[in-house]
Amino acid sequence: EHRAVLQKGEAADGVDPATVVAVWGVESNYGRITGKYPLVSALGTLSCFGRRQDYFRGEFFAALRILQRGDIVPERLYWSWAGAFGHTQFMPATYERLAVDFDGDGRRDLVDNSADALASTANFLRRGGWQSGQPWGFEVRLPAAFDPALAGRRNKRPASDWAARGGVAVDGRTLANSGLADGERTAILL
């Protein structure tokens, strides 16, 4: 059903369809779960109360601009617990920068138009540095004495550092031959 959109997105952005579909599945169960909280009122509240008022104030005004443009009607603009909305869970400010009108109807609708959402996701990944042909990740075997405090996406190190700590690709390749760019900072996700 979405093959043409995904193939066109791959040609334009270099992001393989499987990755875009994986994001869609993780973020909203393929559009089935897109949020249950009214976006504008929730962002308005968060912009006045709490620890991240400045951040949510920017998101609040971005949501108002989305509604003003008519891309999405207010009755359909709901968000998840984390503040994102639509098929692939964009924050309003991210939507403003990266959403695309794939079908050419004049609206960037990530709530009711899966084609716009999938194309926007590919654009988001490309603009975020996606490199076509590069692996996004691979399974690594770690030594029994590996310190789990070193794991996590915030603890990025060159593959050579992980190799020095005993990491080896499960398929037997050394991390140096894993397809990662030399000096690329990577993270171990457990």
Regions from the language model: what does each represent?
Residues 184-190:
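Short, intrinsically disordered, charge-balanced linker/junction segments flanking boundaries
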Residues 1-180:
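Catalytic glycan-binding domains that act on GlcNAc-containing polysaccharides
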